């Protein structure tokens, strides 16, 4: 347990240091180690229950007291008619918005979400008719920040379905999110990016992953 705490502390400390990967000339970060399909195991929520395919859950920052809660859909770009920005709530006690997790490969027999397999994510929140489909996750390069940001929008094949949930600590049910380039076995960590202009914490491709736990709607 002490070793895990030290490892998480070091990861968080490294994240807070100046990061050369944040250069606007390098939107794609260091690839993670490719994990074979044989490592597939069910994703578990904080209660130890299997995460159901197509179910609604909260994805919450795993490190308590680090000024981070759940993931939310925010409207940071006033030039966009729909909210499209994925942020980390600054409130540790805020679970964020509900998120639907669905296997990217349609399988009527799939009842649970598996690690190291492709998944799609979408916010399950009320929107107006114009934005009803603009809730699917994808990666989009932002020239202003020089980051490849996690954004919400319409479902885009070969982008919206390229995410994987990977195990960080099986005992604590800690996970990280990776994004894999279509047609490649290279995957990239999705981590926190502190936007200095908007003074908010967003998610982007990064060296240092965003550790999270999955909370059911009823704990």
Swiss-Prot record:
Tell me the disulfide pairings in this chain.
none
GO CC terms on record? vacuole
UniProt keyword terms in alphabetical order: Signal, Storage protein, Vacuole
Q: Which GO terms describe its molecular function?
A: endopeptidase inhibitor activity; nutrient reservoir activity
**What tissue specificity does the UniProt entry give?**
Accumulates specifically in tuberous roots and tubers upon tuberization. Sporamin accounts 60 to 80% of the total soluble protein of the organ.
Where does the record say this protein resides? Answer: Vacuole
Q: Which residues belong to the signal peptide in this entry?
A: 1-23
A Pfam family this protein belongs to?
A: Kunitz_legume
Question: Mind telling me which InterPro entries this protein's record contains?
Answer: Kunitz_inhibitor_STI-like_sf (IPR011065), Prot_inh_Kunz-lg (IPR002160)
According to its UniProt record, where is this protein mainly located?
A: other
Give the record's family classification: Belongs to the protease inhibitor I3 (leguminous Kunitz-type inhibitor) family.
Chain's role: Major tuberous root protein.
* Protein's name according to its UniProt entry: Sporamin A
What is the organism of origin for this protein?
Answer: Ipomoea batatas (Sweet potato)
């Amino acid at each position: 347990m002490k070793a895990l705490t030290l490892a998480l502390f070091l990861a968080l400390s490294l994240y807070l240091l100046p990061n050369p990967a944040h250069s606007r000339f390098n939107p794609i970060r260091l690839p993670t180690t490719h994990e074979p399909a044989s490592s597939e195991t069910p994703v578990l929520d904080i209660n130890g229950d299997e995460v159901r395919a197509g179910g609604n859950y909260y994805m919450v920052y795993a490190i308590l007291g680090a000024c981070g809660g759940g993931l939310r859909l925010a409207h940071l770009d006033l030039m966009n008619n729909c909210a499209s920005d994925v942020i980390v709530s600054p409130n540790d006690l805020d679970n964020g918005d509900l998120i639907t997790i669905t296997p990217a490969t349609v399988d009527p027999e799939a009842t649970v979400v598996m690690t190291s397999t492709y998944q799609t994510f979408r916010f399950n929140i009320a929107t107006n008719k114009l934005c009803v489909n603009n809730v699917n996750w994808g990666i989009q390069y932002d020239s202003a920040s020089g980051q490849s940001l996690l954004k919400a929008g319409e479902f885009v094949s070969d982008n919206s379905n390229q995410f994987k949930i990977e195990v960080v600590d099986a005992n604590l049910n800690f996970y990280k999110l990776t994004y894999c380039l279509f047609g490649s076995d290279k995957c990239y960590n999705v981590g926190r990016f502190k936007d200095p202009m908007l003074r908010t914490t967003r998610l982007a491709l990064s060296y240092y992953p965003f550790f999270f736990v999955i909370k059911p709607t009823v704990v």
